[in-house]
């Protein structure tokens, strides 16, 4: 932006220009060139059992190592939600056979580049820009996985070829995305380089049997090796052909769910150089623009003298928008976006704002403290290893006053069941949440020291609280 007119992106000249003065949101689509040049418009989650290669597949496709934190690197597991963007290109030379004509690169690659395949001519052209939400596979991190599922449009289900199928979290994650009503799934049979062909075929039959009757029935099963980058271009081709870009709403008031938040200041920074907090998330609808006034709900939560919950929404302004390293003038629904604000950075540090909703002032939904839900319980517990042919434990009915973990979109909060009927329940939430009637929620219960998915529900109505606004 330095030295240029306001409202025009000048960073990264090799990407499409974005100009706020000529922006007409009614003409934008999820495949508009000026949008996908800089940001992803579709979110794809990677799900599956621990150590089946979810993060490695994301790295093979996008070139980004999603494991960001020291304790994650040392233990070689994903703990927080990882994320990475990738551009998928197709060669415009019709003589080039599929799947070689598909290619994936990092998100700041130019939108067109000449072919390097011998015997072909023409350019690789950008066809999709996808965002990967890399979920943890550990059973104790199930809550994080459910938060990630809130923003997914499709999923890659990873199954390691050198273990029998299904492993505990394979089935638990599959149940979770069924709840989220994800229709588009690709199954990746990974680590194919470690097994003989006969084993791979045998496991292929196991996978078919496992997905029968689930939402993943009929999904393509692609044998890959993420480490050797074998068949990754086939995955790219299937992402383009099999996963439709969801229709998006560009004209409503913008709304973004926060799934990460940071304080970007280094310790010892001069006061004048302090930057505001950064919220990362996925826009559900509408378009956010640089310079826009925003509101964050529920905001700062506290209790009054009588112990009642109070919420004070945060009002601020957007200073910058980013998609990975690409700076934006406006951000459309879809991939993960970083929103630089003027909010006090201590409110954003270390994911403190996760589960809050950010959007246009006065256009955000109500804040609920109690929910009345219609719910549906799973028959048996998932994700628990069972010995031999023993069936998994049955899920007990909800009982009054028990404490559950409730996942509403990207927010996990505790909830106490205050009343329960056949398929209706009332839940008093530990933390207030900004949501709408009709929203889906996932319910988990503490079983043997771990939270386990036991069912899901839909919000029928609830008790809302009025946010307090300062009069000064």
UniProtKB/Swiss-Prot annotation:
Residues making up the signal peptide according to the UniProt record: none
Primary role: Member of the eIF2 complex that functions in the early steps of protein synthesis by forming a ternary complex with GTP and initiator tRNA. This complex binds to a 40S ribosomal subunit, followed by mRNA binding to form the 43S pre-initiation complex (43S PIC). Junction of the 60S ribosomal subunit to form the 80S initiation complex is preceded by hydrolysis of the GTP bound to eIF2 and release of an eIF2-GDP binary complex. In order for eIF2 to recycle and catalyze another round of initiation, the GDP bound to eIF2 must exchange with GTP by way of a reaction catalyzed by eIF-2B.
Protein species of origin: Pongo abelii
Catalytic reaction annotation: GTP + H2O = GDP + phosphate + H(+)
Region named G5: 225-227
Family, similarity comment: Belongs to the TRAFAC class translation factor GTPase superfamily. Classic translation factor GTPase family. EIF2G subfamily.
Example of a GO cellular component annotation carried by this entry: eukaryotic translation initiation factor 2 complex
EC number assigned by the record: 3.6.5.3
Record-listed Phosphoserine modification sites: 16
An example molecular function term from Gene Ontology annotations: GTPase activity
Residue span of region G2: 76-80
Region (G4): 190-193
TM segment ranges: none
Start and end residues of each stretch annotated as Interacts with CDC123: 457-469
Gene: EIF2S3
UniProt protein name: Eukaryotic translation initiation factor 2 subunit 3
InterPro entries: EFTu-like_2, eIF2G, eIF2g_C, eIF2g_dom_2, eIF2g_GTP-bd, P-loop_NTPase, T_Tr_GTP-bd_dom, Transl_B-barrel_sf
G3: annotated span: 134-137
Region (G1): 48-55
Gene Ontology biological-process entries: cytoplasmic translational initiation; formation of translation preinitiation complex
Quaternary structure, from the entry: Eukaryotic translation initiation factor 2 eIF2 is a heterotrimeric complex composed of an alpha (EIF2S1), a beta (EIF2S2) and a gamma (EIF2S3) chain. eIF2 is member of the 43S pre-initiation complex (43S PIC). Interacts (via C-terminus) with CDC123; the interaction is direct.
């Amino acid at each position: 932006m330095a030295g240029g007119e306001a409202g025009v992106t000048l960073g990264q000249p090799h990407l499409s220009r974005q100009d706020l003065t000529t922006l007409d949101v009614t003409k934008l689509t999820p495949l508009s060139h000026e949008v996908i040049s800089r940001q992803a418009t579709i979110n794809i989650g990677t799900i599956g059992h621990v150590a089946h290669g979810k993060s490695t597949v994301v790295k093979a496709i996008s070139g980004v190592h999603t494991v960001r934190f020291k304790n994650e690197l040392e233990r070689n597991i994903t703990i927080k939600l990882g994320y990475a963007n990738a551009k998928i290109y197709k060669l415009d030379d019709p003589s080039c056979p599929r799947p070689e004509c598909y290619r994936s690169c990092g998100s700041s690659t130019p939108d067109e580049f000449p072919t390097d395949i011998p015997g072909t001519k023409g350019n690789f052209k950008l066809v999709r820009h996808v965002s990967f939400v890399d979920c943890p596979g550990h059973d104790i991190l199930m809550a994080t996985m459910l938060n990630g599922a809130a923003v997914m449009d499709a999923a890659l289900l990873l199954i390691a070829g050198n273990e029998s199928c299904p492993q505990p979290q394979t089935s638990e994650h599959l149940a979770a995305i069924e709840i989220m009503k994800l229709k588009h799934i690709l199954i990746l049979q990974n680590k194919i380089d470690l097994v003989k062909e006969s084993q791979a075929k045998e496991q292929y039959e196991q996978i078919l049997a496992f997905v029968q009757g689930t939402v993943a029935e009929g999904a393509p099963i692609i044998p890959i090796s993420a480490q050797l980058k074998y068949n990754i271009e086939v995955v790219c081709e299937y992402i383009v052909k099999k996963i439709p870009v969801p229709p998006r709403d560009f004209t409503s008031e913008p709304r973004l769910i926060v799934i990460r938040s940071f304080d970007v200041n280094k310790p010892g920074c001069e006061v004048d150089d302090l930057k505001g907090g950064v919220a990362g998330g996925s826009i559900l609808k509408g378009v956010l623009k640089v310079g826009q006034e925003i509101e964050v709900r529920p905001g700062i939560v506290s209790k009054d003298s009588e112990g009642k919950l109070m919420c004070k929404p945060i009002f601020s302004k957007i200073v910058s928008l980013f998609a990975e390293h690409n700076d934006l003038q406006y951000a459309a629904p879809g991939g993960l976006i970083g929103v630089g604000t003027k909010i006090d950075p201590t409110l954003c540090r270390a994911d403190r704002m996760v589960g809050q909703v950010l959007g246009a002032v006065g256009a955000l939904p109500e804040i609920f403290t109690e929910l009345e839900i219609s719910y549906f319980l799973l028959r048996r517990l998932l994700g628990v290893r069972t010995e031999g042919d023993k069936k998994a434990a049955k899920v007990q009915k909800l009982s009054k006053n028990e404490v559950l973990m409730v996942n509403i979109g990207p927010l996990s909060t505790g909830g106490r069941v205050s009343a329960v009927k056949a398929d209706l329940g009332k839940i008093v939430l530990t933390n207030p949440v900004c949501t709408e009637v009709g929203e889906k929620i996932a319910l988990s219960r503490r079983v043997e020291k771990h939270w386990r998915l036991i069912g899901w529900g839909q919000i029928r109505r609830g008790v809302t609280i009025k946010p307090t606004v300062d009069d000064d």
